[in-house]
Amino acid sequence: MEERKQETTNQAHVLFDRFVQATTCKGTLRAFQELCDHLELKPKDYRSFYHKLKSKLNYWKAKALWAKLDKRGSHKDYKKGKACTNTKCLIIGAGPCGLRTAIDLSLLGAKVVVIEKRDAFSRNNVLHLWPFTIHDLRGLGAKKFYGKFCAGAIDHISIRQLQLILLKVALILGIEIHVNVEFQGLVQPPEDQENERIGWRALVHPKTHPVSEYEFEVIIGGDGRRNTLEGFRRKEFRGKLAIAITANFINRNTTAEAKVEEISGVAFIFNQKFFQELREATGIDLENIVYYKDDTHYFVMTAKKQSLLDKGVILHDYTDTELLLSRENVDQEALLNYAREAADFSTQQQLPSLDFAINHYGQPDVAMFDFTCMYASENAALVREQNGHQLLVALVGDSLLEPFWPMGTGIARGFLAAMDSAWMVRSWSLGTSPLEVLAERESIYRLLPQTTPENVSKNFSQYSIDPVTRYPNININFLRPSQVRHLYDSGETKDIHLEMENMVNPRTTPKLTRNESVARSSKLLGWCQRQTEGYSGVNVTDLTMSWKSGLALCAIIHRYRPDLIDFDSLDEQNVEKNNQLAFDIAEKELGISPIMTGKEMASVGEPDKLSMVMYLTQFYEMFKDSLSSSDTLDLNAEEKAVLIASTKSPISFLSKLGQTISRKRSPKDKKEKDSDGAGKRRKTSQSEEEEPPRSYKGERPTLVSTLTDRRMDAAVGNQNKVKYMATQLLAKFEENAPAQSTGVRRQGSIKKEFPQNLGGSDTCYFCQKRVYVMERLSAEGKFFHRSCFKCEYCATTLRLSAYAYDIEDGKFYCKPHYCYRLSGYAQRKRPAVAPLSGKEVKGALQDGPTADANGLASVAASSAERSPGTSMNGLEEPSIAKRLRGTPERIELENYRRSVRQVEELEEVPEETQAEHNLSSVLDKGTEEDVASSSSESEMEEEEEEDDEDDHLPTSDLGGVPWKEAVRIHALLKGRSEEELEASKNFEPEEEEEEEEYEEEDEEYEEEEEEESSEAGNKRLQQIITAADPLAIQADVHWTHIREREAEERMLPTSESSTSRAPLDEDDLEEDADSEPAETEGEAAEDGDPGDTGAELDDQHWSDDIPSDAEAEHRLQSQAKVKAELELRVSENEEEKPSDAPKQEERGTSQVSSPSQPPEKQVGVFSPARSPGTEEAKSPLATKVKSPEEPLFPTPLLLREKPKAEVPEEQKAVLSPIRSQPVALPEARSPTSPTSLQPESLLAPPTPPTPPPTQLPICSQPQPSSDASIPSPTKSPIRFQPVPAKTSTPLTPLPVKSQGDPKDRLSGPLAVEEVLKRSDLVEEFWMKSAEIRRSLGLTPVDRSKGSEPSLPSPASKPISLKSYSVDKSPQDEGLCLLKPPSVPKRLGLPKSAGDQPPLLTPKSPSDKELRSSQEERRDLSSSSGLGLHDSSSNMKTLGSQSFNTSDSTMLTPPSSPPPPPPPNEEPATLRRKPHQTFERREASIIPPPTPASFMRPPREPAQPPREEVRKSFVESVDEIPFADDVEDTYDDKTEDSSLQEKFFTPPSCWSRSEKLQAKENGRLPPLEQDVPPQKRGLPLVSAEAKELAEERMRAREKSVKSQALRDAMAKQLSRMQAMEMVSSRSHTAQSQGKELGSESTRHPSLRGTQEPTLKHEATSEEILSPPSDSGGPDGSVTSSEGSSGKSKKRSSLFSPRRNKKEKKTKGEARPPEKPSPGLPEDVVAKPKSLWKSVFSGYKKDKKKKSDEKSCSSTPSSGATVDSGQRRASPMVRAELQLRRQLSFSEDSDLSSDDILERSSQKSKREPRTYTEEELSAKLTRRVQKAARRQAKQEELKRLHRAQIIQRQLEQVEEKQRQLEERGVAVEKALRGEAGMGKKDDPKLMQEWFKLVQEKNAMVRYESELMIFARELELEDRQSRLQQELRERMAVEDHLKTEGELSEEKKILNEMLEVVEQRDSLVALLEEQRLREKEEDKDLEAAMLCKGFSLDWS
């Protein structure tokens, strides 16, 4: 019996697993049926099915799923499944929205039946998911069914996978799902209800299907069609001709593919360069492109019609889009080639093979469809009543609201509508009256089209079917039941829609309220008469002749702006001059475009009445609510200024803003409107179409329109302010404008001369045809049709607010092509476009579009306007039938089906076949993954995520090589035996598991998300930013620029290349970075901090990802050894091969530094990342590197260039660090380089010789030389031994170097010089930054610490820059260049008393100076984003080293001499597992000297009380979460931390390992030798730097002294904090600190541990400083503060918006600094800065508090760490672990208890608890992930905003076209040109006025949008510049050429300019927003106004 029972149970488990893992629709249904049969369950019993299934399937894998579903189902809104118990619902379509609706209805207790027409889920297309949708799906157990669901940064999923997930959930809940059933209509209840009480049924095919017998009370259409259910009228949005092409390529999930970054599209919106290159290279002309990596490689692009014609994709050009895109008119082969070519180019040919996936017809999965017209249903639901039966009919998904692709709006709004519909059904079932149900549903539906990820509620955990939980300002009673009566169809209402329009849209043109409208010309005339009263020579009696002299116009302007016109000086006789003056001033100052020229006005007998009405209306609208000058005589100057500002138009502001090429002009009204618009634009962000909607879509109620009008008027005032700002900015822009701008004259001045070749204002300048008043635009004195206003080069339709004009040849260009005007390119390029122009001239609609790829439709529309009706109707009518049938993609699909069946007679291929073909690579792995996911949520998800990381994230991990493989390669390169590899591999898995478990589901989710995200999202970002490797991601700029970058890299062998790369990326980066400066940094750091993160990720992935620390250690050890060797060789080679190294370094640096850190720092960061990844990357490199000269260089080059994609992280990391370091000191550095690279490297750095060389480049040549002698010995031993301890750290140190390396590699001296130069540049940058900050009202970041010292340092000495590393310890001076060496010194110090004193010595001014320079550097690197990543790796390294050190240190009294390292235990051993051993060893080795240097890194963390540790963690956590903060963090923290950590970590770790090594290798002396260099290094620091550092330290002391010092002195418990402080505080601390800092970031305690000793020794700032290194502590502190200040400043520079955050970050950073008066302060500050930076934006206050707390506690901790705490190390470690987990738990679902439990379990499983290093690494990793995720979110937000703006601009264009069309018709009638004779019909005149007003509103709205777009563009540019600058500044100034330095200055200046522009824009928008807020008391009305009618995207 028992056995049989067991078999049954096992079988059930197998069947359940099969069901969960099913990959097709049919397979899922079959598996589910088998499961039910086996368990003897009947799904038809829907009420109890789920509960029975749950009770019968007692399977641990299922329990996690039950838990999630129970949690969801227990929500109060579902009333325990009894809310809709007797309601029967039919859902049409098993798409994502239909299934999602079914799930909610089922949870409500309803009987739900879903019918699906097909039986296969075949759509590979990828959907972008908004954050709430991810949260929602996770809550339904998505990860249980699809382990890779949104892992890491991935936030998209294929439609197929989403359907499978929801299908499985639906089946489990007992929902009936029928496939192969097609809905054909409703069957009304029979009239004879007495005999048969039959209700509503469905008519289906096949007719005999049981579903046809069901009766329903609710039917929901979710099949994506437009006409499945009757009664829903559609609103159409017609944009420009938009042709989309989607393509799916097979994803084989190879490493190479994993490295290719995704493209999210944001960069392309503003980055025209890529599209230009694409067109030049391939002839493909796109408007946009997006690439998502999912089960397939999914590309979606918007192609321009002309390029499709040119490439032969479309055979014939038809006006009708249906004909145009019909299968007969499309060459399929050409289409495939077109898609493949575009995909290949956009990914830089990095996808190895682009084989098409197949669709369900077995054909290549490529589709082309038209989404010019998108539809939205006018209502979401209706009720039908027939024969006593009511039927509630509703729509969800695309049927309700078609999405504008590809922003993820479809699924997001679809899910929202699904929940809204469920809420409606709930109300219906609970007995609410039908009209009330409908009124509530429509009130909610009003908001749906306006939802964006930003304006929905942010508390996703509270989401339920109740709309109040999802829409922030919802008024569910907005509509009254009486207003929706038309939606209740009792079968009697004849004209539902007429009634509906009257009810819902009482006014079709809400904007024109009676009092606002100038409907009667008498009103306008009366206003003009009042304004011109009392002016001599002005007598206004009409709207024509009275204005001829021009005096009346001048009088109106003078009345309001007497400052603009000297009325008394005007001569009444000079008609032309007077009019031209008025026109010019109105255009320039008020944003009102002229309707004619002064010359024309003088030459005509009587001015045209219609033109004058049009023109004067704009003055009326602008000034009607303003005070005239006579009324303002009593106002003070300030009030007058405000008044003046209020009469300035945003448009004019916009036209000046950054219009260095040419002035942008806005339509006459546009500027005015802009004024309104600007204010609205703020709102626009949410629904950017506010105004226009009002004007065109008469959807809003009257109230809304009036409110809107009021708002508009108010906005006008704001506009003026904008204009005022614009004028001020304009002067500056013009000063800075490029020479070319001379050709571009101000519009005003140009207009003054009436072009002789013009026929007048009624003749189009371009096509020479008649241009009517309503369609007339003017720019530069020319008048033309909107559709004729095109770029001479590319024929893109131009906007008045964005164009460039070449005065000499009278041609207009889009800004990107202005530079081509003289190149002959224009002529060459124009041909392709030429037809367009010609066609435009013809005025054919199709031509317009053709010419306009961007605004095809609009052009067409414009032309159509000319011949009203025809074109438009022509376009619309042919496609109407089809359009009503289905959505664009559906139409495409149906076309395909038809053509396929006719031509090839193909049947649909089975879903299995399709899946097998498309997903072969996925399916092989899939089962395991799925199984894993089902296993245990936390474990599974973590595992999967980790797996994903391995597979997909390899990029982040090892640059695309799975870590295991990387390890193997690494080992092989190192000469590791296969067995060892196997051993390490075995080790790693354990660790991975542990980590996974430890992280838990949520954490894991985060990690997964972050890592994968970092892979995917990061890739996307990278793509946008750079094609670089994940490591390079940081630096990555747009992928568009990647190529450039690579080329530049090639050209610039040294850091220059990296810099150059950055610039290339700059544009894209700007976009990305700008919009997400923090993101980019954060992402880079997290994701792409290749140096930091990459290093760390490698490290972490290696170590962290490596589940167990031991494993990681082991791996690290072997890797480190190999790496060390490689690195050494590489270093040597690097010097020899500067160009190669620079490239690679650049890449690595770029990646690393790209975020915030300077290259050096990044290098440091990189190293750590490299150590694992590097080792792997290095393996190839290593081999080559082995031959120091040739191999390394050539390989790096190859690797670097190609591997960018292939070996981005690792190789880049490896090469970068290696090269960098070797450059400075070939010999010394070589060793160091390897050391740095490898964990051992870090350890090795302890050997003074090696580190010094490495550091030397950073610090100064002298150091290298001194160290040089030691390098070789240190090299190998250190390399090998330190590897383990240093794995993380070494990477970090190396990265530091590597960043500085490009030039370093080339030559030590050069490097030094460059470093100096760099520091000068940095200083200049900081100063400017401070200025900007001040101008912004922000407190300038305190740069004195980092920046100033840095400057002096560099100035005084190259070493200065490196001084931070030098700071670490006297010995480390040589090591200085290598941050890690510093650490060794510190360790060394413990080894030898001499060392220790040097540590203290740093106190000395020179020390401080060193520190300052170090700080500066650190700042840079931190800012690069090293901080986060570095922190991770450093933390890890520190954790292993420091923790190990802590343990040993703790074990051994500080005073006792360090015991010799166990002979068998090498640094490598120490590495991860070795951490513990290492710690002991370190302790023994370093103890006496260590007390200050060692103890504090390792032990402090251990000893500090948990609380303290936690605090630190909390701090870290706080800092972790936010991308914005991340940016700051990268800026602040990363810089500080990174450098510091680099230096910091290595010192402690190295000390021990070094000592061990030294002892083992007889290297102790070298360490001591190092010490002297360190001392020397300290002196190297300039006095200025020292002073600055000291000042900083003092300031910090003051702020934190009491707390931090007291704490530090009072308790060693604060050790943790001390650790944090230490990491910031000393360079050794820096190297350590980097690790520690990272750790501290992650595990403040970790940091504290390392720092404690130092702190203890130097309770006072100075004392602490010396202990850390020469100037290490001080330097650390200083540098950390300085860097954080710097980074803050930088961020402020970069992103004005960040200013506040930065301020906070600054403040926060400072408090931390304060906590550790000396090093501790710095250390604390540093970690804090990093963390805070990360979190500052989001949790500024919290951060501050936590920072201060942790700071204060940390210092005390540090002080106490000395003796007792060392022992505490293990405890501390555990606590750190916990804390880290806890801190992460904030981010994750894990609770602290869970974390504790987990950690305890882990420790049980693995006796060895996570070392502090590991913990910190993990923490760092999480932080990085959080930052990455945040950055990604920022990027996505920017993308979303850009796409919304783009779409709205298209909408505005279309509306304008329609208005112009009507206006032309009315004008013709009024002029008698319509064949009816001249009519003075008052009705026509009234109509004319209305149209004029609407057009003005449109223009104003368009200008608003343009301002938003401009602001977004500036944000983006700033972000890219910021990124590039970071990359460049990461390289030591002494490594840079004059050209590079001047380039940096240029970038800085440009950035300042961008910041100023953005600040003015932001200020303007903010002011308008505030004004609007005051005027808008009714929020609901505001929502309405926001474009419910306009924006259906």
From Swiss-Prot:
Show the segment(s) annotated as Monooxygenase domain: 2-494
Under Gene3D superfamilies, the record lists: Calponin-like domain (1.10.418.10), Cysteine Rich Protein (2.10.110.10), FAD/NAD(P)-binding domain (3.50.50.60)
Q: Which residues carry this modification: Phosphoserine?
A: 649, 685, 687, 977, 1131, 1187, 1272, 1276, 1335, 1369, 1382, 1431, 1640, 1692, 1695, 1903
Q: Where is the composition biased (Basic residues)?
A: 1686-1704, 1819-1830
- Entry keywords, A to Z: Actin-binding, Cell cycle, Cell division, Cell projection, Coiled coil, Cytoplasm, Cytoskeleton, Exocytosis, FAD, Flavoprotein, LIM domain, Metal-binding, Monooxygenase, NADP, Nucleus, Oxidoreductase, Phosphoprotein, Zinc
The residues that hold Zn(2+) 1 are 764, 767, 785, 788
Give every bMERB domain span.
1832-1981
Q: Where is the major localization of this protein?
A: cytoplasm
Q: Where is the composition biased (Pro residues)?
A: 1245-1255, 1454-1465
Disordered: annotated segments: 658-704, 854-886, 905-1023, 1039-1309, 1332-1546, 1559-1837
Q: Which residues form the LIM zinc-binding domain?
A: 762-824
Basic and acidic residues: bias regions:
669-679, 975-988, 1039-1051, 1111-1148, 1199-1212, 1405-1420, 1584-1600, 1795-1811
Looking up PROSITE patterns in the UniProt record yields: BMERB, CH, LIM_DOMAIN_1, LIM_DOMAIN_2
Which GO cellular component term is one of those annotated? spindle
Record keyword rRNA processing present: no
**Cell compartments where the protein resides:** Cytoplasm; Cytoplasm, Cell cortex; Cytoplasm, Cytoskeleton; Nucleus
Q: Which reaction does it catalyse?
A: L-methionyl-[F-actin] + NADPH + O2 + H(+) = L-methionyl-(R)-S-oxide-[F-actin] + NADP(+) + H2O
The record's EC number reads: 1.14.13.225
Q: Which residues make up the binding site for FAD?
A: 97, 116-118, 123-125, 183, 298, 398
- Composition bias (Low complexity) maps to 1421-1433, 1665-1685
Residue span(s) of domain Calponin-homology (CH): 518-624
Q: Which Pfam families match?
A: bMERB_dom (PF12130), CH (PF00307), FAD_binding_3 (PF01494), LIM (PF00412), Rossman_Mical (PF25413)
Function comment:
Monooxygenase that promotes depolymerization of F-actin by mediating oxidation of specific methionine residues on actin to form methionine-sulfoxide, resulting in actin filament disassembly and preventing repolymerization. In the absence of actin, it also functions as a NADPH oxidase producing H(2)O(2). Seems to act as Rab effector protein and play a role in vesicle trafficking. Involved in exocytic vesicles tethering and fusion: the monooxygenase activity is required for this process and implicates RAB8A associated with exocytotic vesicles. Required for cytokinesis.
The Swiss-Prot or TrEMBL record describes its family as follows: Belongs to the Mical family.
Quote the record's domain comment.
The bivalent Mical/EHBP Rab binding (bMERB) domain, mediates binding to predominantly Rab8, Rab10, Rab10, Rab13 and Rab15 (in their GTP-bound forms).
- Protein name, entry field: [F-actin]-monooxygenase MICAL3
- Please give the organism: Mus musculus
The gene it comes from is Mical3
